[in-house]
Amino acid sequence: MSIRHCVAVDLGASSGRVMLASYQSGPRALTLREIHRFTNSLQKVDGFDCWDVDSLEGEIRRGLEKVCEQGILIDSIGIDTWGVDYVLLDKQGQRVGLPISYRDDRTQGLLRHAEEQLGRAEIYRRSGIQFLPFNTLYQLRALVEQQPELVSQAAHALLIPDYFSFRLTGNLNWEYTNATTTQLVNINSDSWDETLLNWTGAPLAWFGTPTHPGNVIGHWICPQGNRIPVVAVASHDTASAVIASPLADRHAAYLSSGTWSLMGFESLTPYTCDAALQANITNEGGAEGRYRVLKNIMGLWLLQRVLKEQHVSDLQGLIARTAALPACRFMIDCNDDRFINPASMSAEIQAACRDAGQPVPESDAELARCIFDSLALLYARVLNELAALRGQPFSQLHIVGGGCQNALLNQLCADACGIAVVAGPIEASTLGNIGIQLMTLDELANVDEFRQVVRDNAALTAFTPNPDSEIARFVAQFQPQQTKELCA
């Protein structure tokens, strides 16, 4: 019985992991084991919020070396990360400056300038991507305006996962699913849109042709001298998470729940009609030519910040205390850009409630209750928008990613959306990363086959909607309200 060993490097905004997957083709058994975990945080450099990619590279290499030290022969490696951020390289392949985080405020006002100069409808017609103030489209314009000295030194721009693949292999690659998050890929041609790039001022020569997931970028030479293929997986972490979502049929929606919440459905065609533009829906690239028609929601970033500020270490204890509180006393619009990166998330939530003339949450449990209720109600609104867009209701919602461990939020989501929820797998991004590697190794034929492997191996939990819950009764009152978009 053959066993394949694939390594997934999964980088998030607050932490990174090197995970080892073992796959037995006979029983189609798939197991995951964490090899190395490390923190990831922003550092202030010359007034910008930057990623310490040198430290991250060191941690990635350490994790890979740990696998090799155990005598395991790695069959392949794949890397997935968050989207939109990039690294500049010079002609010698050396890094130019530090990559600036999407949470930095350098792009302030640039989205509005783009709309005024290019037209909102025209940008959407070309890209099909949701308007977010930190998209690479606006980041590059900020670079050209604020750091022209770096522009003259640069020869290439690589998105974060492609940069780390380059550091392991020495080969350049521009992976398609992540490239689409930039708002710079033409939705009709799957290549870089020259009109949009020209607006940024960045040269087209910085970018190579986007390639769909599944190609071997190059090889990493392990300490023992073995040449290990580095696969271009669906390198946007949400694209990987969707691959691992065990969607039963085309009437199932997904919610990738983590720092960001991304809710959507799969489609063979993009949705770029006026209604999609009005709803600020995104059409990001997926595997096998599928589109991830979805909407970005601020997600558990709010909770992560509150936990840190309130010095909460027992999350499950907090959730239990939160569940005992009445629902829907404190309501915020989680997609208001005031929550992107405030000095104090707790104070910002309190200020938002105060501004709305509501009771103000004081304790950590009240703040968490505010976040959970507000997210669940926003999930319901977005799910309705998506159903209206496709002209059909959804039969089921799959919640995947780290956030699916929050049973209270899962039940609130089921109640608010009035739909059956299936939670799991937790390690969705890692599993989707592994799935593309297994397809590249010819162990599996396609995404649907891999999803069956996920169903057979992952722990899944069902949540049935309760129409008599407090939040279900509140939905009718919440739905007509307008929420702000992140581009406001």
UniProtKB/Swiss-Prot annotation:
Its EC number is 2.7.1.5. Its cofactor is Mg(2+). ATP binds at residues 13-17, 259, 304, 402. Pfam families: FGGY_C, FGGY_N. It catalyses: L-rhamnulose + ATP = L-rhamnulose 1-phosphate + ADP + H(+). The keyword Signal does not apply. Belongs to the rhamnulokinase family. GO terms for molecular function: ATP binding; glycerol kinase activity; rhamnulokinase activity. The gene is rhaB. GO terms for cellular component: cytosol. InterPro entries: ATPase_NBD (IPR043129), FGGY_C (IPR018485), FGGY_N (IPR018484), Rhamnulokinase (IPR013449). It is an enzyme of class 2 (transferase). This is Rhamnulokinase. The lineage of its organism: Bacteria, Pseudomonadati, Pseudomonadota, Gammaproteobacteria, Enterobacterales. It comes from the Bacteria. Substrate binds at residues 83, 236-238, 296. Involved in the catabolism of L-rhamnose (6-deoxy-L-mannose). Catalyzes the transfer of the gamma-phosphate group from ATP to the 1-hydroxyl group of L-rhamnulose to yield L-rhamnulose 1-phosphate. One of its GO terms (biological process) is glycerol metabolic process. Disulfide bonds join 68-222, 353-370, 413-417. HAMAP family: Rhamnulokinase. The active site is at 237 (proton acceptor). It comes from Klebsiella pneumoniae (strain 342). Pathway: Carbohydrate degradation; L-rhamnose degradation; glycerone phosphate from L-rhamnose: step 2/3. Gene3D superfamilies: 3.30.420.40.
